């Protein structure tokens, strides 16, 4: 957070000294001195990030646009969700009429927020990009189908959604089925990979948690460990 605060401070200082600070493509927003709170500064930066960008020209340099997009994402975890979503909506609306640019942003968003190797994984933020991308109707049919599937999976797995019914096979070979039970306090469904250290550690943590064990014993919580 300290380094990001210094970045924001540096942008303001540079703006005062030189009149503007750029990222190689366009002028970055100049955060007013009157905004001193870190969260508020992040909000301003995210909300006004593309104000000086000519998005019809920015995509001519894909490398620079990639760097600009990464810088755009960098402060989002520290900004308010409503500010972030409004900024994404506005940005995507300005890009929406150019199919190749939409596909470029779609690939960037997936690699930055959703892929296994993503440095900043956020289903909610990626879903916001996806919803805007799908609205454009500018994708090829294979990509449209791909992103529609991702969108459906993410929407259905958000907090508060009800998991679908499914059948499974127990370790002893017997069959079982999961059906949503509204009388349960909670249901935990863990998708695990046998022999995977992260899966094993997650199960051990649950087993070792006293409060969880008591909730399971009382029947208020059910835990399913499923190996797809």
How does the language model describe each region?
Residues 155-158, 178-181, 215:
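Short boundary motifs at domain starts and secondary-structure transition points
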Residues 16-174:
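Oxidative protein folding and maturation machinery
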Residues 1-21:
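Bacterial Sec-dependent N-terminal signal peptides
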Residues 161-163, 183-184, 218:
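Extracytoplasmic
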Residues 93, 204-211:
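Surface-exposed alpha-helical segments enriched in charged/polar residues
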